[in-house]
Amino acid sequence: MKKIETGAARPETFPEQWPGQCEVFSHFEYACGIPSILYAVTTYKENGLGNVCCGAWASFPGDGGGFYALVPLPASTHTLANIRRTGEFCVNFLPVRHFDALMRTVRQNGMEDDEFTEGGFTPEPARTVGAPRIAESFLTLEC
């Protein structure tokens, strides 16, 4: 395994993916942001259809006061609107074999798309919140 080594200056091995990327974000965010396990935040859309928002970059810290899911969720997403509307969601952790299925939910995520169906996932009721869980997940946080 090759170690990533970087200093204050952005190394040439970290090319910008879009103009000005490393002016907005530090190259350290890419060097230190190790991909985590696949997860998907699930909610119901306002029309009752399933919403699946996949991710692989997050932090799940905890202390005596609680356990927290720190996930990037842009303001323009259905997911954030759904969470603001209901106050409920699930964080579903999935094996890597579900990566392609999660990518289908990214490509088919309109208001009229049931993203569980698009990804081939089985929705199941959560035990403590009104948001749906993904039955194929090996761990779900109900929030």
What is the predicted role of each segment?
Residues 55:
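Core nucleotidyl-transferase/polymerase catalytic module
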Residues 1-51, 59-142:
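Active-site-proximal mixed secondary-structure blocks
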